[in-house]
Amino acid sequence: MKICRICGYQIPEGEFNLLEDGWVCPRCGVGKEELQDSAEPLGGRDPLMLIFRAMTVGLWRVLGNGSQGVTREMGSVIADNIRHGDDPLKSAADYFIEHGFAASISTDTENFALNVKNCSFYGFCCSLEEDGVLLSTCPYANTAAAVLERTTGYRYRIKRNKGDHGHIIEFSRISKK
């Protein structure tokens, strides 16, 4: 069994050997060189992700859009651990790349946007959206918003759009803090 090191996608060894050179993971978009050997298929889903999913769905059912007050705090906690540079979005992107959350994150400082590719949470986020849960738990979005708020003094509205094997996250100023 081969398993994608980014998103956990699994493919049997026999099928892997038949893949063409240009093949990319259907879930996160990395090349086949990012698939690793595994003695046996993963049994079930990662328990921590199941717990996180249950908390997210529960928050959404109870609070709806109000759950964003809780999930924004997640970004603030992560922002406390980021080395801030001249470019707050790049600082946040570098942190997530360094910790293996995504294969690449490009930043557009002028338009306050992140383009996250090969996200390790992509499949998780898509499953939440398919279940009707507005995704407010994105660590990239919440952390980048917290870093921007700290450096500019403004609050930001977050908008996420689907990109190629990830999301494009845009931030728009809404008010002074």
UniProtKB/Swiss-Prot annotation:
Domain of life according to the entry: Archaea
InterPro entries recorded: Rubredoxin-like_dom (IPR024934), Rubredoxin_Fe_BS (IPR018527)
Binding site for Fe cation: C4, C7, C25, C28
Cofactor(s) annotated in UniProt: Fe(3+)
This protein's UniProt keywords: Electron transport, Iron, Metal-binding, Transport
Gene3D superfamilies (UniProt xref): 2.20.28.10
UniProt GO molecular function: iron ion binding
Cofactor note: Binds 1 Fe(3+) ion per subunit.
SUPFAM superfamilies on file: Rubredoxin-like
Positions of the Rubredoxin-like domain: 1-38
UniProt family annotation: Belongs to the rubredoxin family.
Name assigned to this protein: Putative rubredoxin
The organism of origin for this protein: Methanothermobacter thermautotrophicus (strain ATCC 29096 / DSM 1053 / JCM 10044 / NBRC 100330 / Delta H)
Gene name as annotated: rdxA
